[in-house]
Amino acid sequence: MAARLCCQLDPARDVLLLRPFGSQSSGPPFPRPSAGSAASPASSLSASDESDLPLGRLPACFASASGPCCLVVTCAELRTMDSTVNFVSWHANRQLGMPSKDLWTPYIRDQLLTKWEEGSIDPRLSIFVLGGCRHKCMRLP
């Protein structure tokens, strides 16, 4: 069973806070990567670098045609942190009027992460609960 992390962006200090979900109330901040610190797309996660995974790196299954692993992309609303939901299902429900079913991938890449970094994301999802998988990481363009 993969550990779940509570990831929260602190715009005042420009850091991403990673905390164990449900076991600890605080954790050490990890700086977001600079543009020049891109990691190799084929690098796999080891136990040592799992704790400081940069915001810009996501598992390769995140952008697969069949969608990401359920444990990787789960989220919870601030008021109901105990009940996580699958992000793909949540996003599909919000995008019912979109003409194509596969538009969630570019939306996540281009808009969601940008909104999160700018602090203008939907306040109900300002904290994400992410689980881990062992897929290789990729660098977002």
Swiss-Prot record:
Q: Compositionally biased, Low complexity: which spans?
A: 24-48
GO terms of biological process kind? DNA-templated transcription; symbiont-mediated activation of host NF-kappaB cascade; symbiont-mediated arrest of host cell cycle during G2/M transition; viral genome replication
Task: Please verify whether the record's keywords include Chaperone.
Answer: no
Question: Has the keyword Flavoprotein been applied to this entry?
Answer: no
Q: Where in the cell is it found?
A: Host cytoplasm; Host nucleus; Host mitochondrion
Q: How does it get modified after it is made?
A: A fraction may be phosphorylated in insect cells and HepG2 cells, a human hepatoblastoma cell line. Phosphorylated in vitro by host protein kinase C or mitogen-activated protein kinase. N-acetylated in insect cells.
Where primarily located? host cell
Task: Please give the residue ranges the record annotates as the region Mitochondrial targeting sequence.
Answer: 68-113
Region annotation (Disordered) ranges: 24-51
Any one Gene Ontology cellular component term annotated for this protein: host cell mitochondrion
Keyword tags: Activation of host NF-kappa-B by virus, Activator, Apoptosis, Host cytoplasm, Host G2/M cell cycle arrest by virus, Host mitochondrion, Host nucleus, Host-virus interaction, Modulation of host cell cycle by virus, Transcription, Transcription regulation
Record Pfam families: X (PF00739)
Family, according to the entry, reads as follows: Belongs to the orthohepadnavirus protein X family.
As for what it does, the entry says: Multifunctional protein that plays a role in silencing host antiviral defenses and promoting viral transcription. Does not seem to be essential for HBV infection. May be directly involved in development of cirrhosis and liver cancer (hepatocellular carcinoma). Most of cytosolic activities involve modulation of cytosolic calcium. The effect on apoptosis is controversial depending on the cell types in which the studies have been conducted. May induce apoptosis by localizing in mitochondria and causing loss of mitochondrial membrane potential.
User: How does the record describe its quaternary structure?
Assistant: May form homodimer. May interact with host CEBPA, CFLAR, CREB1, DDB1, E4F1, HBXIP, HSPD1/HSP60, NFKBIA, POLR2E and SMAD4. Interacts with host SMC5-SMC6 complex and induces its degradation. Interacts with host TRPC4AP; leading to prevent ubiquitination of TRPC4AP. Interacts with host PLSCR1; this interaction promotes ubiquitination and degradation of HBx and impairs HBx-mediated cell proliferation.
Protein name per UniProt: Protein X
User: Which organism does this sequence originate in?
Assistant: Woodchuck hepatitis B virus (isolate 1)
